[in-house]
């Protein structure tokens, strides 16, 4: 599902379980790879949310996105922080599970 500055907060606050928020842009080769790899991977999340960084400058600023793709974990409306891993399923699973153990915070 695609989110933007106007829809992200409501969607993330209402979504039960784990959500992976993924910032990408059309001109980013690694982002195109992420759009292929992530939906096909078996990840410990209930859903993937995509944000076009070029169209959602407010979210980019609030989440402190500097490099794309940028991945963040949200659980039951709480922010668990960035997920930093290569775009390979085992590494992503491990990074998501590590992020899931963090102390939850309010969404940025």
Residue ranges and their predicted role:
Residues 7-41:
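Local sequence-structure signature of Cys/Sec-based thiol-disulfide redox active-site neighborhoods
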Residues 1-18, 101-108:
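N-terminal leader/targeting and pre-domain segments
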Residues 2-3, 23, 44-58:
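Thiol-based oxidoreductase modules, predominantly thioredoxin-like and allied folds used
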Residues 73-108:
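Non-catalytic, surface beta->alpha helical segment in thiol-disulfide oxidoreductase systems
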Residues 63-72:
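Structural micro-motif
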Residues 7-11, 55-59, 91:
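Short acidic active-site motifs
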